[in-house]
A protein has these predicted regions:
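Immediate post-signal-peptide N-terminus of mature secreted/exported proteins
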Residues: 6-53, 57, 147-153
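Sec-dependent bacterial lipoprotein signal peptides
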Residues: 1-5
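Short, charged, amphipathic alpha-helical segments
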Residues: 46-54, 79-84, 113-124
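Amphipathic, heptad-repeat alpha-helices with coiled-coil/zipper character that mediate oligomerization
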Residues: 23-26, 50-58, 83-102
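Short, charged/polar, low-complexity loop and linker segments
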Residues: 36-40, 61-74, 110-120
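Short, solvent-exposed, charged loop/turn and helix-capping segments
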Residues: 62-84, 99-104
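A charged, solvent-exposed segment within the mature domains of Sec-exported extracytoplasmic proteins
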Residues: 102-153
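Short, charge/polar-rich alpha-helical segments
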Residues: 13-22, 77-88
């Protein structure tokens, strides 16, 4: 009976983790679409604006979803770590991605080496800040897994 209870608890912890990761995946999918939009030389202003608005909305919905998911059995550690990650995404989208949108929408004749350098610098900041935030989340996820006997691939 105890083994069954532990397995059930581990299964619930795995399901909880999967819900959070599914919410994160929604944001990542929108980031991929936005990055593709930046690469698309034929992207219209409307398409850029639409994808940017979708990205902003997904991040905000994900943050709200964490509140409805709640803590796992009174343990808020993974929820709080995910919220920190999603808030990092929110800051990147509201500031760094906004700069990339502004650059993307510049007329071709306005793009000079300074703009190109600025674009590359923003992309580098996004990469580094994302990496740091994701590493923090993965560490919290590993700790959560150890607590509830989960292994992550």
């Amino acid at each position: 009976m105890i083994v069954m209870s532990c397995a059930s608890r581990a299964e619930r912890a795995a399901d909880y983790n999967d819900r959070i990761v599914g919410t994160q995946k929604s944001i990542v999918d929108a980031l991929v679409v936005m990055d593709s939009t930046f690469s698309d030389t034929n992207a219209t202003k409307e398409w850029v604006d639409l994808n940017y608005a979708d990205l902003q909305a997904r991040v905000k919905r994900a943050i709200l979803a964490l509140d409805s998911i709640g803590p796992f059995q009174e343990d808020p550690s993974l929820q709080l770590s995910a919220k920190e990650l999603f808030r990092s995404y929110e800051a990147l989208v509201d500031f760094e991605y906004k700069k990339l949108v502004e650059i993307k929408l510049l007329p071709d004749v306005s793009v000079d080496m300074a703009i190109v350098d600025s674009n590359l610098a923003v992309q580098e900041r996004i990469f580094m800040q994302s990496k740091i935030a994701q590493e923090r989340f993965y560490k919290a996820q590993e700790e959560f897994g150890k607590k509830y006997n989960l292994e992550f691939e």
